[in-house]
């Protein structure tokens, strides 16, 4: 992929996959049972045809979408590494919500550090 600093399109599905793969060194995005590739293509078409993104807006969305694909790669890798976790029931999930800069990240990390 050639870098174009003035690029106004966000990217193609294949370019985003290649970028995410290069970043983390993984290439298994899992099955496409949820049709995420098609949905990603629709989103990219909308960015290109409807959103009127600036060059900066395109870069920001490219970065955001690549991050989502990296998360998918890491998640798939973890499911493959620990397949027994599929059978673990989550009985009482905890949702941490709040406004920006109110300590939700700190609370989330604190809860995540609990060995129980």
Regions inferred by a protein language model and the residue ranges of each:
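PAPS-dependent sulfotransferase catalytic core
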Residues: 1-116
